[in-house]
Design a protein with these regions (language model features):
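Alpha-solenoid helical repeat scaffolds
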Residues: 1-175
Length: 175
């Protein structure tokens, strides 16, 4: 890693060093190298996802947000960054910020997007709308979640539960 002390113009050598450290289970040593990769190449999704996995494992929601925020600019088509940033805000009980991130993520959805992730976006949005007492929007979000994945257990459970609590559309809740 002594070569990494020199200013790099290409992220390839740093990424190679990081991959070597990761294969040797030297995550702590790989972390600053992965940050160096992102300084050189902020669009490097594998490096950012690896750092993100470390932050998630440590349950460091501030770091998750810090890693995801620039990713939304550099790689706006990678839905995982919206997902984890939205979840981090949700865990920090920042409902408005979480909802904003998920809305931006939904705007990036294409025919090629992972339908499970898209369904989860909408399911979580349903939960967030419910927290904000915006039930019409919550039910619309749950409906959208089920369009993308009809057996999304989280969406089905919360949708049915909230309908039963409100005593509305009980036949729909039973479905």
């Amino acid at each position: 890693t002594s070569i990494l002390k020199e200013k790099q113009e290409n992220a390839d050598i740093a990424m190679l060093a990081a991959q070597y450290l990761l294969t040797k289970k030297m995550d702590k040593e790989a972390t600053p190298v992965l940050h160096q990769v992102l300084e050189i190449d902020p669009e490097n999704t594998p490096a950012r996802l690896q750092l993100l996995s470390f932050a998630i494992r440590e349950q460091n929601m501030d770091e998750v947000i810090k890693l995801c925020a620039p990713a939304l600019e550099y790689t706006p088509d990678v839905l995982e960054f919206y997902y984890y940033m939205g979840l981090a805000y949700h865990q920090k009980e920042k409902t408005d910020e979480a909802l904003e991130v998920f809305k931006k993520g939904v705007n990036q959805v294409t025919d090629k997007s992972n339908k499970d992730i898209v369904s989860d976006f909408y399911a979580i949005m349903g939960d967030l709308y419910h927290i904000k007492k915006m039930n019409v929007e919550a039910y619309a979000a749950y409906d959208s979640a089920l369009v993308y994945k009809e057996n999304n257990i989280g969406a089905l459970n919360n949708y049915a539960y909230y309908l039963s609590v409100e005593r509305k559309n009980l036949d729909k809740a039973e479905e």
